[in-house]
UniProtKB/Swiss-Prot annotation:
Residues 43-58 have a biased composition (Basic residues). One of its GO terms (cellular component) is ribosome. This is Small ribosomal subunit protein bS21. The keyword Ribonucleoprotein applies. InterPro entries: Ribosomal_bS21 (IPR001911), Ribosomal_bS21_CS (IPR018278), Ribosomal_bS21_sf (IPR038380). PANTHER family: MITOCHONDRIAL 28S RIBOSOMAL PROTEIN S21, SMALL RIBOSOMAL SUBUNIT PROTEIN BS21. GO terms for biological process: translation. Residues 37-58 are annotated as: Disordered. Signal peptide: none annotated. Belongs to the bacterial ribosomal protein bS21 family. It comes from Enterococcus faecalis (strain ATCC 700802 / V583).
Amino acid sequence: MSKTVVRKNESLDDALRRFKRSVSKAGTLQESRKREFYEKPSVKRKKKSEAARKRKKF
């Protein structure tokens, strides 16, 4: 869980920017999007192999 404390004399925009950066570094949004819906193990394997094939292509 990302936590950001607003510093003294810091604007809300700056604090929000720091919070967004910490959330993206932690991978919180990507993880929640990945776990939003149940995905069968067979579908996971298929997506994983397709991603590997795509990486190998380039």
